[in-house]
């Protein structure tokens, strides 16, 4: 009988999944996967020339797999259901320390540019590149061509000619499948390709990964099916989900910024639960810090009335952010002032909506100005229901601001139910009265505001970009490579079987 270990067309035997049953008959019950709590990878791998022992404590150390409970459970799924210390019965293949210490060659396809386009994932990718380079990895970045530097922390950056998104002109898109880019990536010889999704460039990244026979990881950052009804036609939602399913089923691993988004992808059939991982939160606690509080900035944000209660919103100003809700909220808080920091296609309309009201629109701020803007407010508000995580919420908390945000998308991953009222407040999406009640509590009670702001700051100090990057590099990329090798085995197995029968080896020559 042909075994996986007999396949030798292009994969060395020591890189194949072991077919040894690690469960004895007496322990079969304990080795069976619980019906409603876990997905099981049945075969550990041998890496190098020795088999790696896998202890129960290390079962999920490399990933944090989303369990079936995350799919079939209630809508109150939280980050705790995607955690490192999950006790599900999973054999996690781990690379040995020697393999992990070797530099990797990583090709990143990011659309739009994390260098020129202001968005929530800009800091995520910039810090990711920075810490990969600090770990000694070689990195090449393919992105849209506007404002692209030649290099970033030693990583080479390639700009691909882009075009504006038809329904969102400020978002540049690019297929990144020109002969020049294919040639550059082929010469680079990546160990793994990582592409942001959804978008147009991810198709180019997938094609190149297949051409070069390289594992591909896709990280999901923009919940486009939620945006579509606000920008185009609702009937396009189903075709969009079909595209997302096509892309992520072709990926070797999918990364998501929050458990809630992971749940949506699994429910839509876009990926298998055991091929989904969480990209851990991170925040630059030095750049976003209460020490940046500035009276001068507060005067600017309050339009010359720094003694008035000041509400802050930071982020892209788009119709999908539900910012029109804040008009009704501020109508009920006439004593307060509000400042919008950011730019976007909805800015002009929002300014018209707030005509005659005590609202300031600063446009895009960066560097110390942005740090000062965060730290100089009293409360941060986030009405958006479409956030895959909400990095601006983390930045506000790191700046010592209490947050009032919609209980939607990835926000409950940042302020879980057991932390509501301690590190921030969540309100029911679209509920003006609920939002007003929680804002008023904070705006008029300085002591409560300071206690929650301090607790929020302490909470965000747990989140570190270096640790998040290390986890992806050492554990989640390793998982992607393992799934990719496993997929190749499944493809080559029937071919190997056919060759053995067409060209049998005489017994005397074995």
UniProtKB/Swiss-Prot annotation:
Transmembrane parts of this sequence: 198-218
**Catalyzed reactions per annotation:** UDP-alpha-D-6-sulfoquinovose + a 1,2-diacyl-sn-glycerol = a 6-sulfo-alpha-D-quinovosyldiacylglycerol + UDP + H(+)
One Gene Ontology MF term: UDP-glycosyltransferase activity
Q: Which GO terms describe its cellular component?
A: chloroplast; chloroplast envelope; chloroplast membrane; plasma membrane; plastid
Membrane-topology descriptor: Single-pass membrane protein
Q: What induces the gene encoding this protein?
A: By phosphate depletion. Repressed by phosphate (Pi) and phosphite (Phi), with a faster suppression in roots than in shoots.
| Any one biological process term the GO annotation gives | glycolipid biosynthetic process
Question: What's the main place this protein lives?
Answer: plastid
Pfam families tied to this protein? Glyco_transf_4, Glycos_transf_1
Q: Which residues carry this modification: Phosphoserine?
A: 88
From what superkingdom does this record's organism come?
A: Eukaryota
Keywords on this record? Chloroplast, Glycosyltransferase, Lipid biosynthesis, Lipid metabolism, Membrane, Phosphoprotein, Plastid, Transferase, Transit peptide, Transmembrane, Transmembrane helix
Q: What happens when the gene is disrupted?
A: Lack of sulfolipid leading to reduced growth under phosphate-limited growth conditions.
Supply the InterPro entries for this chain.
Glyco_trans_1, Glyco_trans_4-like_N, Glycosyltransferase_grp1
Q: What is its EC number?
A: 2.4.1.-
Location in the cell: Plastid, Chloroplast membrane
EC top class named in words: transferase
Organelle targeting sequence: 1-83
Pathway listed: Glycolipid biosynthesis
Report if keyword Chaperone is assigned: no
| Annotated function | Catalyzes the transfer of the sulfoquinovose moiety from UDP-sulfoquinovose to diacylglycerol during sulfolipid biosynthesis. Sulfolipid contributes to maintaining a negatively charged lipid-water interface, a requirement for proper function of photosynthetic membranes. Sulfolipid may also function as a substitute of anionic phospholipids under phosphate-limited growth conditions.
Record-stated family: Belongs to the glycosyltransferase group 1 family. Glycosyltransferase 4 subfamily.
> What is the protein name given in its UniProt record?
Sulfoquinovosyl transferase SQD2
Q: Which organism is this entry from?
A: Arabidopsis thaliana
Which gene is annotated as encoding this protein in its UniProt record? SQD2
């Amino acid at each position: 009988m042909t075994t996986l270990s007999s396949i030798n067309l292009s994969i060395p035997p020591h890189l194949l999944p072991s077919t040894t049953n690690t469960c004895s008959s007496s322990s079969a019950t304990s080795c069976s996967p619980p019906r409603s709590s876990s997905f099981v990878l049945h075969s550990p791998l041998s890496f190098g020339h020795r088999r790696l022992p896998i202890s129960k404590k290390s079962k999920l150390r490399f990933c944090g797999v989303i369990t079936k409970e995350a799919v079939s459970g209630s809508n109150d799924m939280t980050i705790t259901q995607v955690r490192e210390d999950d006790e599900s019965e999973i054999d996690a293949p781990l690379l040995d320390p020697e393999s992990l210490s070797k530099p990797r060659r990583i090709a990143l396809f990011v659309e739009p540019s994390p260098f020129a386009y202001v968005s929530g994932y800009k800091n995520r990718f910039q810090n990711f590149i920075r810490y990969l380079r600090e770990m000694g990895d070689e990195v090449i970045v393919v992105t849209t061509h506007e404002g692209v530097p030649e290099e970033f922390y030693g990583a080479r950056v390639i700009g691909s000619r882009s075009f504006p998104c038809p329904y969102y002109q400020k978002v540049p898109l690019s297929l990144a499948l020109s002969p020049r880019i294919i040639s550059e990536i082929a010469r680079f010889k990546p160990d793994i390709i990582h592409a942001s999704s959804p978008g147009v460039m991810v198709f180019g990244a997938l094609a190149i990964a297949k051409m070069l026979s390289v594992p591909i990881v896709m990280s999901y950052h923009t919940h486009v099916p939620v945006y579509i009804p606000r920008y185009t036609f609702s009937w396009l939602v189903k075709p969009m989900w079909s595209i997302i399913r096509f892309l992520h089923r072709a990926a070797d691993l999918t990364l998501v910024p929050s458990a809630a988004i992971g749940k949506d992808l699994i429910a839509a059939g876009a990926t298998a639960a055991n091929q989904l991982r969480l990209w851990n939160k991170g925040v630059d606690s030095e750049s976003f810090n209460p020490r940046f509080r500035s009276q001068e900035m507060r005067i600017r944000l309050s339009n010359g009335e720094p003694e008035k209660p000041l509400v802050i919103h930071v982020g892209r100003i788009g119709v999908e952010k539900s910012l029109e809700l804040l008009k009704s909220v501020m109508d009920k808080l006439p004593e307060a002032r509000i400042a919008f920091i950011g730019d976007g296609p909805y800015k002009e309309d929002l300014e018209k909506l707030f005509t005659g009201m005590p609202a300031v629109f600063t446009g895009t701020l960066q560097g110390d100005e942005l740090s000062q803007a965060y730290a100089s407010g009293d409360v941060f508000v986030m009405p958006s229901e479409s956030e895959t995580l909400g990095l601006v919420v983390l930045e506000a908390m790191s700046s010592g601001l209490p947050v009032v945000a919609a209980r939607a998308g990835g926000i409950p991953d940042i302020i879980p139910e057991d932390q509501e009222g301690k590190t921030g407040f969540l309100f029911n999406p679209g509920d003006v009265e609920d939002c007003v009640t929680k804002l008023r509590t904070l705006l008029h009670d300085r002591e409560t505001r300071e206690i929650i702001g301090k607790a929020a700051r302490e909470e965000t100090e747990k989140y570190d970009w270096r640790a998040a990057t290390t986890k992806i590099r050492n554990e989640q990329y390793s998982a992607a490579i393992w799934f990719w090798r496993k997929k190749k085995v499944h493809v080559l197995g029937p071919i190997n079987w056919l060759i053995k029968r067409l060209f049998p080896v005489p017994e005397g020559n074995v």
